[in-house]
Amino acid sequence: MTQSRSTPTKPATPETPNIPSADKWQASLFEAMAVLRNQTSPRFDVLLKRGTMSVEVYAPQKQDHQTPHRQDELYIIQSGAGIFSRDGQRSPCRAGDVLLVPAGMDHRFEDFTDDFVTWVIFWGPDGGEAA
């Protein structure tokens, strides 16, 4: 049996990203980037979702206007480089880096390159998991 790699339930718009079906188990960065090319800010796409977990791709342009999220999250930098600001601390980041942000913490990417793309993984309950 062949599993569809990308079968969103509805077309993505800047206000409403793709929401994948619950049985989707594989995603493609190339397919996500094709969706993002047609979006303006914010540029992100939900690739996989199961329970509280979601896998997304995020490619900000010029500025990152994020606000704190209700869930814990991981960023896995796919391409590019920049500065990651997290709870008042700033650190360089680049392709291959993994960054952890607890739920509710102020964070954003700054001074990033034009080719900056990151995977985003959200999981856990509202308010995050216990430390």
Name these PLM-found stretches.
Residues 72, 98-100, 122:
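A generic "structured core" feature
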Residues 52, 71, 115-116:
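A structure-centric signal for secondary-structure junctions around beta-strands
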Residues 1-57, 62-66:
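A short, N-terminal "cap"/entry segment at the start of jelly-roll beta-barrel domains
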Residues 69-84:
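Short, conserved beta-strand element in jelly-roll/cupin
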Residues 103-129:
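Ligand-binding loop in jelly-roll beta-barrel domains
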Residues 55-56, 84-86, 118:
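Short hydrophobic/aromatic-rich beta-strand segments that constitute the beta-sheet cores
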Residues 88-103:
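Short acidic-glycine-tyrosine-enriched beta hairpin
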Residues 49-51, 85-89, 112:
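Short strand-coil-strand connectors
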